[in-house]
Amino acid sequence: VSILKYYLYKATKAVEFYRPIMYLFFLAQGLSFTQIAILEALYNLTTLFGEIPTGYIGDRVGRRNSLLIGTSIIALTLLGIGLSNSFLPLAGLYVCWSMGYNFRSGSEDAWLYDTLTDDLSEDEFARVRGRGESVALAVGAGAAVVGGYLGSIDLSYPWFVAAGVTSIGVVVLLSLDDPETYKRTNSEALSLRQTVGIVRDVLTRRQLRAFLLYYYVLYAGVTYLVFVFLQPIFETVVLDLGVAQSQVESLLGWFYAAYSIVGAVLSYYTGTIERTVGLRTWFLVLPFAVSGALVGMYFVPLLALPTFLLIRGLSDVTRSFAGQYINDRIETLGRATVLSAMAMVSGLAVVPFQLGSGVISDTVSPLFALAVGGVVLAGGSGAILLWQEPIGEKRG
């Protein structure tokens, strides 16, 4: 029953309504591109500095309560953004928005893993999480199309609908309870110093440190750039194919829908992929396959469209596998904080990739920036593998 409610919660989380019109909305409120960039920076900085404290709170007050706090903040923030018409209120709301996701980030996976542990089925984490992502992405595909239509009527409407759908998640969460595995830990006695010690102990393990660099820094950093440059590259490719400029926005809405559907299908089969391919083979092959695709796009730009669909589809499956791998190697006490620490490192790692790729894109082109990212991914992954194989077959 808890897992079915988890799927329902994931469906309310997939609020892609505002995604196709997000930047159009900000421009319509009179914001400059510089101000939009400042909003993104505020979001990332809040994520960076908020991950550990919110993970700690999640370990203290409970996974369910942490998710409840985060979801409530997000729903109110989305409503606020729809009502805003200037930069300063949006800046404050962006900080709140990021904090809402901080409360969710470590606690969601920690709640799911501990719930599965109650039933002695923690090995099913990747499969169940994958199914949850599949539900979220399938709902998101429809939401992207609906959001584009609502935005053509009024750019505020998608934000209001997204706030309403997110608030349904609050109702779902109120019907959930914390797992028995979590309740049996002495979480109320968990001090901040003890929490930092737990994170430090995890990061002193050489293999986990290698995995952190391999996936959370290198792979996550480079593939993040794909999501940043999708729109300008998509526009370049379809215009070269003879599509009229006036059709680009509507095509983007449908491409985002396709993008979500590919992710939904692959996420649904996460468990099958894990059994067939195995975590070790997946992580050893993936960086080099993605790297080859990114470099190939530069020489054949048309390859960008299937490459974007594939990398998007693989991202959620890979995140589920990474969550399974880390969760298998950490204890229940402090779990949310450790997972938040991983997210924090990943958020910090993205910054130099963002700055470097921005300069390269302005100087040459976004396609060239992604090709450079591909070379960095292959070279860095190879170097880490020579130093320490990041994936072990057995838990430890």
Segments from the language model and where they lie:
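Conserved MFS/SLC helix-loop-helix module at the cytosolic interface between two early adjacent transmembrane helices
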Residues: 49-88
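A single, central transmembrane helix in multi-pass transporters
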Residues: 18-19, 25, 156-160, 201-265
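Cytoplasmic helix-loop-helix junction between adjacent transmembrane helices
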Residues: 94-138
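C-terminal ends and interior cores of transmembrane alpha-helices
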Residues: 72-86, 91, 174, 288-301, ...
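Juxtamembrane intracellular "pre-TM" segments in multi-pass secondary transporters
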Residues: 173-214, 236-240, 288
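Pair of pore-lining "gating" transmembrane helices in MFS-fold secondary transporters
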Residues: 1-34, 95, 203-226, 309-313
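Helix-loop junctions on the cytosolic side of multi-pass membrane transporters
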Residues: 162-187, 386-396
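Transmembrane alpha-helix termini and helix-breaking/packing motifs in multi-pass membrane transporters
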Residues: 27-28, 87, 139-162, 231-243, ...
